[in-house]
Amino acid sequence: HKGDEHTLVIRARGKRTGTDYLRLGLNLSDDMEGDSAFNIGASYRMNGINRLGAEWLTRLQIGDQQELYTEFYQPLDVGSRYFIAPYAAIESQNVEAILDNDPVAEYRLERYGFGLNVGRQIGNSGEIRFGVGEAWGKADVRIGDQSLPSESFNEGFYQLKYSFDSLDNVYFPHAGEDIGLAFRQFEPELGSDQRYRQWEFKLDKALSFGPDTYVLGGRYGRTLDQANVVTSSFLLGG
Protein backbone atom coordinates (compact mmCIF):
# COMPACT_ATOMS: atom_id res chain seq x y z
CA HIS A 1 0.00 0.00 0.00
CA LYS A 2 1.36 3.43 -0.94
CA GLY A 3 0.33 6.57 0.92
CA ASP A 4 1.38 10.18 0.67
CA GLU A 5 4.58 9.67 2.67
CA HIS A 6 5.06 5.94 3.31
CA THR A 7 5.24 2.81 1.19
CA LEU A 8 4.51 -0.68 2.55
CA VAL A 9 6.22 -3.50 0.64
CA ILE A 10 5.22 -7.12 1.36
CA ARG A 11 7.47 -9.92 0.13
CA ALA A 12 5.83 -13.32 0.55
CA ARG A 13 8.08 -16.33 1.00
CA GLY A 14 6.68 -19.60 -0.23
CA LYS A 15 6.53 -22.55 2.14
CA ARG A 16 8.28 -25.75 1.08
CA THR A 17 5.57 -28.08 -0.18
CA GLY A 18 5.51 -31.83 -0.08
CA THR A 19 5.28 -34.57 2.49
CA ASP A 20 8.35 -36.25 3.95
CA TYR A 21 8.33 -40.02 4.40
CA LEU A 22 10.07 -42.24 6.95
CA ARG A 23 10.03 -46.01 6.40
CA LEU A 24 11.30 -48.80 8.64
CA GLY A 25 11.84 -52.43 7.70
CA LEU A 26 13.06 -55.79 9.03
CA ASN A 27 14.25 -58.75 6.98
CA LEU A 28 14.96 -62.25 8.34
CA SER A 29 16.07 -65.28 6.33
CA ASP A 30 17.14 -68.88 7.01
CA ASP A 31 18.16 -71.65 4.61
CA MET A 32 17.21 -74.42 7.09
CA GLU A 33 20.82 -75.62 7.01
CA GLY A 34 22.25 -73.44 9.76
CA ASP A 35 22.83 -70.26 7.77
CA SER A 36 20.64 -67.31 8.71
CA ALA A 37 20.74 -63.55 8.22
CA PHE A 38 18.91 -60.43 9.36
CA ASN A 39 18.74 -56.83 8.19
CA ILE A 40 17.14 -53.75 9.76
CA GLY A 41 16.66 -50.74 7.53
CA ALA A 42 15.23 -47.23 7.44
CA SER A 43 14.75 -44.68 4.68
CA TYR A 44 13.86 -40.99 4.76
CA ARG A 45 12.59 -39.07 1.73
CA MET A 46 12.32 -35.27 1.65
CA ASN A 47 9.91 -34.00 -1.02
CA GLY A 48 9.34 -30.57 -2.54
CA ILE A 49 12.83 -29.27 -1.75
CA ASN A 50 12.71 -26.61 -4.48
CA ARG A 51 10.18 -25.13 -6.92
CA LEU A 52 10.89 -27.90 -9.44
CA GLY A 53 9.89 -30.62 -6.96
CA ALA A 54 13.29 -32.08 -6.08
CA GLU A 55 13.50 -35.04 -3.69
CA TRP A 56 16.28 -36.29 -1.44
CA LEU A 57 16.31 -39.96 -0.43
CA THR A 58 18.60 -41.43 2.23
CA ARG A 59 18.56 -45.13 3.12
CA LEU A 60 20.40 -46.93 5.95
CA GLN A 61 20.57 -50.66 6.61
CA ILE A 62 22.47 -52.67 9.22
CA GLY A 63 22.86 -56.40 9.70
CA ASP A 64 24.23 -59.05 7.38
CA GLN A 65 24.10 -56.62 4.46
CA GLN A 66 25.03 -53.08 5.52
CA GLU A 67 24.25 -50.10 3.32
CA LEU A 68 24.22 -46.31 3.31
CA TYR A 69 22.69 -44.82 0.17
CA THR A 70 21.75 -41.25 -0.73
CA GLU A 71 20.23 -39.85 -3.93
CA PHE A 72 19.10 -36.39 -5.04
CA TYR A 73 16.27 -36.47 -7.59
CA GLN A 74 16.03 -33.24 -9.60
CA PRO A 75 13.39 -32.63 -12.32
CA LEU A 76 14.76 -30.53 -15.19
CA ASP A 77 11.80 -28.14 -15.38
CA VAL A 78 8.40 -27.43 -13.83
CA GLY A 79 6.12 -30.29 -14.79
CA SER A 80 8.94 -32.00 -16.68
CA ARG A 81 9.06 -35.78 -16.86
CA TYR A 82 12.83 -35.68 -17.39
CA PHE A 83 15.20 -35.67 -14.42
CA ILE A 84 18.75 -36.18 -13.23
CA ALA A 85 19.65 -38.18 -10.12
CA PRO A 86 23.20 -38.18 -8.69
CA TYR A 87 23.82 -40.76 -5.96
CA ALA A 88 26.46 -42.14 -3.61
CA ALA A 89 26.57 -45.48 -1.79
CA ILE A 90 28.56 -47.45 0.77
CA GLU A 91 27.83 -51.14 1.30
CA SER A 92 29.26 -54.19 3.03
CA GLN A 93 28.16 -57.81 2.75
CA ASN A 94 29.30 -61.43 3.08
CA VAL A 95 30.03 -63.25 -0.20
CA GLU A 96 30.98 -66.89 -0.72
CA ALA A 97 33.86 -67.92 -2.99
CA ILE A 98 32.77 -70.92 -5.06
CA LEU A 99 34.95 -73.67 -6.55
CA ASP A 100 33.30 -76.49 -8.52
CA ASN A 101 29.89 -75.40 -7.15
CA ASP A 102 31.11 -75.73 -3.55
CA PRO A 103 31.87 -72.81 -1.19
CA VAL A 104 35.55 -72.71 -0.20
CA ALA A 105 35.60 -69.45 1.77
CA GLU A 106 33.47 -66.51 2.82
CA TYR A 107 34.64 -62.96 2.17
CA ARG A 108 33.56 -59.67 3.69
CA LEU A 109 33.09 -57.36 0.73
CA GLU A 110 33.17 -53.57 1.10
CA ARG A 111 32.19 -51.28 -1.78
CA TYR A 112 32.12 -47.48 -2.14
CA GLY A 113 30.60 -45.82 -5.17
CA PHE A 114 28.83 -42.92 -6.83
CA GLY A 115 27.12 -42.21 -10.12
CA LEU A 116 24.71 -40.10 -12.13
CA ASN A 117 21.46 -41.14 -13.81
CA VAL A 118 19.40 -39.29 -16.41
CA GLY A 119 15.84 -40.47 -16.73
CA ARG A 120 12.24 -39.96 -17.72
CA GLN A 121 8.99 -40.77 -15.98
CA ILE A 122 6.59 -42.99 -17.93
CA GLY A 123 3.01 -42.27 -16.97
CA ASN A 124 2.31 -42.15 -13.25
CA SER A 125 3.87 -45.50 -12.33
CA GLY A 126 6.98 -46.10 -14.42
CA GLU A 127 10.37 -44.62 -15.18
CA ILE A 128 13.48 -45.40 -17.19
CA ARG A 129 17.04 -44.36 -16.30
CA PHE A 130 20.39 -44.37 -18.06
CA GLY A 131 23.59 -43.53 -16.22
CA VAL A 132 27.23 -44.10 -15.46
CA GLY A 133 28.79 -45.13 -12.17
CA GLU A 134 32.06 -45.88 -10.49
CA ALA A 135 32.88 -48.02 -7.45
CA TRP A 136 35.88 -49.42 -5.66
CA GLY A 137 36.50 -51.58 -2.63
CA LYS A 138 38.10 -54.66 -1.12
CA ALA A 139 37.26 -58.20 -0.04
CA ASP A 140 38.90 -59.90 2.97
CA VAL A 141 38.60 -63.56 4.00
CA ARG A 142 36.12 -63.86 6.87
CA ILE A 143 35.66 -67.65 7.09
CA GLY A 144 37.96 -70.23 5.53
CA ASP A 145 41.61 -70.47 4.57
CA GLN A 146 43.22 -67.30 5.92
CA SER A 147 46.10 -67.71 3.47
CA LEU A 148 43.75 -66.81 0.62
CA PRO A 149 44.60 -63.34 -0.68
CA SER A 150 42.54 -60.25 -0.03
CA GLU A 151 41.22 -58.57 -3.14
CA SER A 152 40.94 -54.93 -4.16
CA PHE A 153 38.84 -53.92 -7.14
CA ASN A 154 37.65 -51.02 -9.26
CA GLU A 155 34.40 -50.84 -11.21
CA GLY A 156 33.19 -48.44 -13.89
CA PHE A 157 29.94 -49.08 -15.70
CA TYR A 158 27.02 -47.94 -17.82
CA GLN A 159 23.58 -48.91 -16.57
CA LEU A 160 20.04 -48.95 -17.92
CA LYS A 161 17.15 -49.38 -15.47
CA TYR A 162 13.39 -49.68 -15.90
CA SER A 163 10.91 -49.70 -13.02
CA PHE A 164 7.14 -49.88 -12.73
CA ASP A 165 5.26 -49.61 -9.43
CA SER A 166 1.46 -49.79 -9.31
CA LEU A 167 1.08 -51.08 -5.73
CA ASP A 168 -1.88 -49.29 -4.15
CA ASN A 169 -0.22 -48.94 -0.73
CA VAL A 170 3.44 -48.63 0.26
CA TYR A 171 3.10 -50.64 3.48
CA PHE A 172 0.13 -53.02 3.03
CA PRO A 173 -0.73 -53.29 -0.67
CA HIS A 174 -3.89 -55.07 -1.82
CA ALA A 175 -3.36 -54.81 -5.57
CA GLY A 176 -0.71 -53.95 -8.15
CA GLU A 177 2.87 -54.95 -8.84
CA ASP A 178 6.40 -53.63 -8.43
CA ILE A 179 8.66 -54.52 -11.37
CA GLY A 180 12.33 -53.72 -11.86
CA LEU A 181 14.75 -54.58 -14.67
CA ALA A 182 18.40 -53.46 -14.70
CA PHE A 183 21.33 -54.00 -17.06
CA ARG A 184 24.97 -53.05 -16.38
CA GLN A 185 27.96 -53.01 -18.72
CA PHE A 186 31.31 -52.85 -16.92
CA GLU A 187 34.01 -51.23 -19.06
CA PRO A 188 37.79 -50.76 -18.56
CA GLU A 189 37.48 -47.39 -20.30
CA LEU A 190 35.42 -46.25 -17.30
CA GLY A 191 37.99 -47.59 -14.82
CA SER A 192 36.72 -51.15 -14.39
CA ASP A 193 39.23 -53.97 -13.81
CA GLN A 194 37.23 -56.30 -16.08
CA ARG A 195 34.74 -56.09 -18.93
CA TYR A 196 31.52 -58.00 -18.27
CA ARG A 197 27.74 -57.62 -18.26
CA GLN A 198 25.08 -58.21 -15.63
CA TRP A 199 21.33 -58.03 -15.54
CA GLU A 200 18.80 -58.33 -12.74
CA PHE A 201 15.03 -58.73 -12.61
CA LYS A 202 12.65 -58.37 -9.67
CA LEU A 203 8.89 -58.71 -9.29
CA ASP A 204 6.52 -58.25 -6.36
CA LYS A 205 2.82 -58.90 -6.98
CA ALA A 206 -0.05 -58.24 -4.56
CA LEU A 207 -3.00 -60.65 -4.78
CA SER A 208 -6.21 -60.27 -2.76
CA PHE A 209 -8.78 -62.98 -2.06
CA GLY A 210 -11.62 -61.54 -0.03
CA PRO A 211 -10.19 -60.26 3.27
CA ASP A 212 -6.81 -61.94 2.64
CA THR A 213 -3.91 -60.44 0.68
CA TYR A 214 -0.69 -62.15 -0.39
CA VAL A 215 2.41 -60.48 -1.77
CA LEU A 216 4.50 -62.83 -3.91
CA GLY A 217 7.94 -61.83 -5.07
CA GLY A 218 11.05 -63.06 -6.80
CA ARG A 219 14.53 -61.92 -7.83
CA TYR A 220 16.88 -63.18 -10.53
CA GLY A 221 20.35 -61.94 -11.40
CA ARG A 222 22.93 -63.18 -13.89
CA THR A 223 26.49 -62.33 -14.90
CA LEU A 224 26.79 -62.87 -18.66
CA ASP A 225 30.59 -63.05 -18.97
CA GLN A 226 33.60 -64.38 -17.06
CA ALA A 227 34.26 -62.21 -14.02
CA ASN A 228 35.69 -62.35 -10.51
CA VAL A 229 33.18 -64.44 -8.55
CA VAL A 230 33.61 -62.58 -5.25
CA THR A 231 33.34 -58.99 -6.44
CA SER A 232 30.65 -59.61 -9.08
CA SER A 233 28.32 -61.77 -6.96
CA PHE A 234 24.64 -60.93 -6.55
CA LEU A 235 22.95 -60.87 -3.17
CA LEU A 236 19.25 -61.25 -3.87
CA GLY A 237 16.52 -60.59 -1.37
CA GLY A 238 18.55 -58.34 0.94
Residues of each region from the PLM?
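C-terminal outer-membrane beta-barrel translocator/porin domains of Gram-negative envelope proteins
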Residues: 7, 21-31, 146-151, 155-238
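Gram-negative/organellar outer-membrane beta-barrel architecture
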Residues: 2-167, 236-238
